[in-house]
Amino acid sequence: MTNQILITTTESIPGKHYEVLGEVFGLTTQSKNVFKNIGASLKNVVGGEIRAYTEMMTESRDVAIDRLRQNAIEMGADAVVMMRFDSGSIGTDMQSVAAYGTAVKYID
């Protein structure tokens, strides 16, 4: 079985017939180290993008997608449709990201 499956935000995959296997999720909670948090606090005073947190969000998103993909593979899926993200803060320096969608298996 391949590690590469299609993950799409669309409702359907044009030209493919499939059965729904169920929901799949990928979850992660990330935080930056204390030094990056101090730098972010200083940046908060003067304004502008806080790159350490942007990087953390990008990393969190990638981890969540990888975990969603693994969850789908374990279910025997060929693809994930309707993939979405949700995120939220925990305290002042942690971020949770959930990637979720519907695992499907192609019908020949």
Swiss-Prot record:
Domain of life from the UniProt record: Bacteria
Cross-referenced InterPro entries: UPF0145_dom_sf, UPF0145_YbjQ-like
Region forming the signal peptide: none
Any Pfam family: YbjQ_1
Family per similarity comment: Belongs to the UPF0145 family.
UniProt cross-references to PANTHER family, sorted A to Z: UPF0145 PROTEIN SCO3412, UPF0145 PROTEIN YBJQ
The name this protein goes by in its record: UPF0145 protein LCA_1282
Organism, as annotated: Latilactobacillus sakei subsp. sakei (strain 23K)
